[in-house]
């Protein structure tokens, strides 16, 4: 199991937890829209660090993006396995061809 899979499992386990007991549970309690908003905020922070060129800060913000992506997905009952299956299906396909196939 990868660290991302372990994190996804931890996020999923927090869905029913007391919001006072964990940040993840608190996000879930605020609803999927708030989870999506927080993901967007973290993505913007990662973009800023990418533009600035600070590798360590970008890596840290990217970790936050991955965490908040998992929370947002879980809030809508989409699993990491589902996302990985989409990536696997796209593997080996030209990005241009794949995008054209979406219609």
Swiss-Prot record:
Question: Per the record, a Pfam family?
Answer: PRA-PH
What Gene Ontology molecular-function terms does this entry list? ATP binding; phosphoribosyl-ATP diphosphatase activity
**Which stretches are transmembrane?**
none
Cite the entry's keywords alphabetically.
Amino-acid biosynthesis, ATP-binding, Cytoplasm, Histidine biosynthesis, Hydrolase, Nucleotide-binding
Annotated coiled-coil segments of the chain: none
Q: Give the EC number(s) under which this enzyme is classified.
A: 3.6.1.31
Please indicate if the UniProt record lists Amino-acid biosynthesis as a keyword: yes
Task: Give the record's pathway.
Answer: Amino-acid biosynthesis; L-histidine biosynthesis; L-histidine from 5-phospho-alpha-D-ribose 1-diphosphate: step 2/9
Give the UniProt record's GO annotations in the biological process aspect: L-histidine biosynthetic process
Q: Where in the cell is it found?
A: Cytoplasm
Q: Does the keyword ATP-binding apply?
A: yes
Source organism, top-level taxon: Bacteria
Query: Into which EC class is this enzyme placed?
Result: hydrolase
* One of the record's GO cellular component terms: cytoplasm
Reactions catalysed according to its record: 1-(5-phospho-beta-D-ribosyl)-ATP + H2O = 1-(5-phospho-beta-D-ribosyl)-5'-AMP + diphosphate + H(+)
Q: What is its main location?
A: cytoplasm
What is stated as this protein's family in its record?
Belongs to the PRA-PH family.
Please identify the protein, giving its name as recorded.
Phosphoribosyl-ATP pyrophosphatase
Where does this protein come from, organism-wise?
A: Cereibacter sphaeroides (strain ATCC 17023 / DSM 158 / JCM 6121 / CCUG 31486 / LMG 2827 / NBRC 12203 / NCIMB 8253 / ATH 2.4.1.) (Rhodobacter sphaeroides)
Gene from which this protein is expressed: hisE
């Amino acid at each position: 199991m990868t660290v991302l899979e372990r994190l996804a499992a931890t996020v999923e386990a927090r869905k029913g937890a007391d919001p006072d007991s964990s940040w993840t549970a608190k996000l879930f309690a605020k609803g999927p829209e708030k989870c999506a908003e927080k993901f967007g905020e973290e993505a913007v922070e990662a973009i800023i660090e990418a533009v600035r060129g600070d590798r360590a800060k970008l890596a840290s913000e990217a970790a936050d993006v991955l965490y908040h992506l998992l929370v947002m997905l879980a809030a809508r009952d989409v699993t990491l396995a589902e996302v990985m299956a989409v990536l696997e299906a796209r593997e080996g396909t030209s990005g241009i061809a794949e995008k054209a196939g979406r219609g």
